[in-house]
UniProtKB/Swiss-Prot annotation:
GO BP term (any one): tetrahydrofolate biosynthetic process
Protein name per Swiss-Prot or TrEMBL: GTP cyclohydrolase FolE2
Broad enzyme group: hydrolase
Protein's organism: Ectopseudomonas mendocina (strain ymp)
Record has Chaperone as a keyword: no
Pfam families, alphabetized: GCHY-1 (PF02649)
Family matches, as HAMAP family: GTP_cyclohydrol_B
Residue ranges of coiled coil: none
Amino acid sequence: MNEQLLPDIAAQATHHDLPLHWVGMAGIALPIQLAGQALNASVDIGVSLDDAGARGIHMSRLYLALQGLAGKPLTLAALQHLLDDCLSSHHELSDSASLTVRGALPLQRPALVSQLSGWKHYPFEIHARQDGRGLHMELQVELDYSSTCPCSAALARQLIQQRFAESFAQQPLNYLDVLDWLGSTQGIVATPHSQRSTATLQLRLAADCIDLPLLALLEAAERALGTPVQTAVKRADEQAFALANGQNLMFCEDAARRLHRALRQLPQASAFRVRVVHAESLHAHDAVAESRWNWS
C-alpha cells in the first residue's frame, strides 16, 4: 500500500471540542549519561492539546525527538532543545511541552577509615516544562542516612549510669576494673536505637542555572546529615560509623532543619522542598518532617 494512502486518524477532527492539559507517553526506556555515569532512564514526555478541535497529537514525533538524547550527556541545554523541538512539531496544536526523566545515579563512595569503597544508587527525577512563560526545571533526589534517636540515647546513658552505681557502690574505684566493666555487656547494658532514614529533596532551579546541580545537591545534603549509609566496610569503618552516629544524634525535625539550611546555601535553587522519613526501629510507624522555602 502506498504510504500516502495510510489513514491518519489522529489528524481527524473531534466532535468533543475539549482541550487537554497533557497528552504523551510514559515509561520510555532511554540510555543517558549523567554526572559522568552511563545509566538507563525512564522518560515521560508530552505536550498540551490546546486545539480543542484536534483529535490527538503526533506521538511518534515526540518519540523520535527524544531519541536524540540517547547515549548523550543529559544537560539543561539538551532538555531545552528537546522541548523546543516538541513544540515546533506541534505548533498548530500545543502551547506547552514537558518531560520527566527518572533513574538512579550510581556513585562510588569511600569507606570512613579503610581503603575500601563501594557503589550507591541515588534515585532522581528531572522535571522540565517549556511554555509561554519560559523554561521551568525541577530536580528531585533521594538519599539514605542513619539516624540515632536522642531520646533513646539519653535513656541508654541513664541505664548505664545506674548499672555503674550498682556495680561500684560498695568498693573503691580501680582504673582497670572500670575499664574492663566499660568493655563488657554487664556495663553497657543498653544502646540507643538507630534506623535507616531517607531524605527526598526537590529543587526548583534558578533561571540562570547552567548545569544540573545533582552532585552539588547530594554532597551538600550528605555533609549536612553527617551519617550517610556506607557501602563496603571493615571493622574499623564500622567502629567509625558507630562513633559518628553517637556524636550525631537527631530527630527527624533536626534532619529537616539541617537540610533546609544546607539547601539555602545553593545558588542554583530558587525554591525547594525537603521531606525526611525515619523508618523507626522502635515503632511500627515512620517519623516524618517536611520543610520548604519559596515553594508553591
